[in-house]
């Protein structure tokens, strides 16, 4: 029997063991999509205790605590931090089979050197031990990033953000990691969203452009894209909960924009038209600047109205959507490809039923120049599990090129989440090892090792081409 989460955790054959320890384990990390705070990175934020580092803002953990019967006061409420931690310690043993069980122990092992299993009995001692370490040297936000061998961090930023801390970090020669902005213009595309006119005003202020027409709106967006570019930004991200496409013209999109600013209700069809044209415009801009565009598709957000009113968004009340994506997605990609304006694109869906839709579609839009120009993004959110990762990788390898996959990201708000890359890398190595053991792939360790290192780091390095000397990538 294998020891619990020992050195060969998830590595079930000799080839996998060799690939992980000799090729994958020490590769650097490019975290090209996350929700870390650039302010906290710049200030090298320290944590008062393990609850602040682990449980604040982590809706993954909150969801299973609720499922375990933990009252909200111990999750997002006003219970003391030690009691919140003990509520988590009570939940962890019940989470076997959930990746959080493994991630929790990986984080304890890698960052704190704690190999004890977390439960109610060990909770008090682990609370004291982790807190003692957190109050010492080497546990600030920057320290945790450096300790994880991260070279690039791409945050998620609104177009109206000042990027103040990105710019300060860019000039900070004492920190060897590039912290780059990620352009997230969702508030500018959801025209029926409450607060849209106010956001347009914020965009006007940020871009220093008067916005009374759709033309001016697009000019302001372009100005902000170029500002992000000057700060080192090379990625955009779009939360497209429902994939839409509706053929339209710039004039019609302009009419819809004007109607909304004047308080007229925008129909569902007009909303689709506005989003379509604005996305097409942004695609052309991203292509010009050689950015990578990310689509996160098919999330069903804020499904519990009572708790949404009580706690707000991003608190653990989202789920998978099951909208059809194939036709609107291909129509959008095709519409910009026809104009030679399709940028590098990474497609994620929260619904695993879309795996083969995406895996098959991406190769319809490869350009024969950039390897893996259109990517099937790594398993996301509820699919960020051993089975979910394997399903995504197998779909990609069955109909595309697994070897050109740009690999893992954290998509996290926690500075302790970089062990997810280790979890992912072990799964990659074991999958390839299984192919070898089954006689499906030759045991050419030089070839397989280079493929593993590509998926871990090298492919992302060549794909994004982040221009930042201090990152040394």
UniProtKB/Swiss-Prot annotation:
One of its GO terms (molecular function) is glucuronate isomerase activity. Its EC number is 5.3.1.12. It catalyses: D-glucuronate = D-fructuronate; aldehydo-D-galacturonate = keto-D-tagaturonate. Pfam families: UxaC. InterPro entries: Metal_Hydrolase, Uronate_isomerase. Keywords: Isomerase. Induction: Induced by galacturonate, repressed by glucose. One of its GO terms (biological process) is D-galacturonate catabolic process. Member of the exu locus which is required for galacturonate utilization. This is Uronate isomerase.
């Amino acid at each position: 029997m294998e020891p619990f989460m020992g050195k060969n955790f998830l590595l079930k054959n000799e080839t996998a063991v060799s690939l992980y320890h000799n090729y994958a384990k020490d590769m650097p990390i490019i975290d090209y999509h996350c929700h870390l705070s650039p302010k906290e990175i710049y200030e090298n934020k320290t944590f008062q205790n393990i609850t602040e580092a682990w449980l604040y803002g982590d809706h993954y953990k909150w969801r299973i605590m609720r499922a375990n019967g933990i009252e909200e006061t111990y999750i997002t409420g006003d219970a003391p931090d030690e009691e919140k931690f003990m509520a988590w310690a009570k939940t962890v043993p019940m989470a076997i089979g959930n990746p959080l069980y493994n991630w929790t122990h990986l984080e304890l092992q890698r960052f704190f050197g704690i190999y004890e299993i977390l439960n109610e009995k060990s909770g008090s001692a682990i609370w004291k031990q982790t807190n003692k370490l957190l109050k010492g040297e080497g546990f600030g936000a920057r320290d945790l990033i450096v300790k994880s061998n991260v070279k690039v961090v791409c945050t998620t930023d609104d177009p109206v953000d000042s990027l103040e801390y990105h710019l300060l970090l860019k000039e900070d020669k004492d920190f060897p990691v590039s912290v780059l902005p990620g352009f997230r213009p969702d508030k500018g595309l959801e025209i029926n969203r409450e607060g849209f006119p106010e956001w347009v005003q914020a965009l006007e202020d940020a871009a220093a452009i008067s916005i009374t027409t759709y033309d001016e709106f697009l000019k302001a967006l372009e100005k902000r894209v170029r500002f992000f570019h000057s700060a080192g930004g090379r990625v955009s991200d779009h939360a497209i909960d429902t994939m839409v496409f509706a053929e339209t013209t710039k004039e019609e999109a302009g009419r819809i924009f004007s109607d909304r600013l004047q308080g007229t209700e925008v129909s569902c069809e007009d909303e689709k038209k506005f989003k379509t044209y604005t996305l097409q415009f942004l695609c052309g801009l991203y292509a010009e600047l050689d950015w990578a565009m990310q689509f996160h598709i098919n999330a069903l957000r804020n499904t519990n109205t009572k708790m949404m009113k009580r706690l707000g968004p991003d608190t653990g009340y989202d789920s998978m959507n099951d909208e059809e994506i194939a036709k609107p997605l291909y129509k959008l990609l095709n519409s910009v490809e026809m104009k030679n304006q399709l940028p590098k694109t990474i497609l994620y869906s929260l619904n695993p039923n879309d795996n083969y839709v995406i895996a098959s579609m991406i190769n319809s839009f490869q350009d024969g120049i950039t390897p893996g120009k259109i990517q099937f993004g790594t398993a996301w959110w509820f699919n960020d599990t051993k089975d979910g990762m394997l399903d995504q990788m197998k779909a990609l390898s069955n109909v595309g090129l697994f070897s050109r996959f740009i690999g893992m990201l954290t998509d996290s708000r926690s500075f302790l989440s970089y062990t997810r890359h280790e979890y992912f890398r072990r799964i990659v190595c074991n999958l390839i090892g299984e192919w070898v053991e089954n006689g499906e792939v030759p045991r050419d360790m030089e070839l397989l090792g280079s493929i593993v290192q590509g998926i871990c780091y090298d492919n992302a390095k060549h794909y994004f081409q982040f221009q930042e000397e201090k990152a040394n990538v």
